């Protein structure tokens, strides 16, 4: 029983630390060729935010991407004038890699 209590306490401690520490995401204003060219950094997601990557493609060619903490992030795909925009969301530290 003591071993189980210790395991439970350790597990709860990790969950608490995750909440206190917050979700950390990569930020980049402009990524070209999967390399951050401007605004590289990190953000800590606030309530209702997730890590996000929005990538823009023309045909099969990646044009550029942005990376950020995004409020009420939704995965979506849209196309306008031949430019495809794809938004991906994730909830693990630094999951929005470039």
Curated annotation (Swiss-Prot):
Cellular component GO terms held in the UniProt record: acrosomal vesicle; extracellular space
Instruction: Detail the disulphide connectivity of this chain as listed in its UniProt entry.
Output: 25-51, 28-36, 43-69, 73-89
Query: From which residue to which does the signal peptide run?
Result: 1-22
| Superkingdom of the source species | Eukaryota
* GO MF annotation terms: acetylcholine receptor regulator activity
Q: In which tissues is it expressed?
A: Specifically expressed in prostate, testis and spinal cord. Present in the acrosomal region of sperm cells. Present in apical epithelial cells of prostatic duct.
- Per its UniProt record, what Pfam families does this chain match? UPAR_LY6
Q: Does the keyword Signal apply?
A: yes
Q: Ranges for the UPAR/Ly6 domain?
A: 23-98
Q: Which UniProt keywords apply?
A: Cytoplasmic vesicle, Disulfide bond, Secreted, Signal
Provide the primary localization.
Answer: secreted
One of the GO BP terms on file: regulation of neurotransmitter receptor activity
Subcellular localization(s) per the UniProt record: Secreted; Cytoplasmic vesicle, Secretory vesicle, Acrosome
- Physiological role: May modulate the function of nicotinic acetylcholine receptors. May enhance sperm motility.
What does the similarity note say?
Belongs to the PATE family.
Q: What is this protein called?
A: Prostate and testis expressed protein 4
């Amino acid at each position: 029983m003591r071993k189980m209590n210790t395991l439970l306490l350790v597990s709860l401690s990790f969950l608490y630390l995750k909440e206190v520490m917050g979700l950390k995401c990569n930020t980049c204003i402009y990524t070209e060729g999967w390399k951050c060219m401007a605004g590289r950094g990190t953000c800590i997601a606030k309530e209702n935010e997730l890590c996000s990557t929005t990538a823009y493609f023309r045909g099969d060619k990646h044009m550029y991407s942005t990376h950020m903490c995004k409020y009420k992030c939704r995965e979506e795909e849209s196309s306008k004038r031949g430019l495809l925009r794809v938004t991906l969301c994730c909830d693990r530290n630094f999951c929005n890699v470039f």
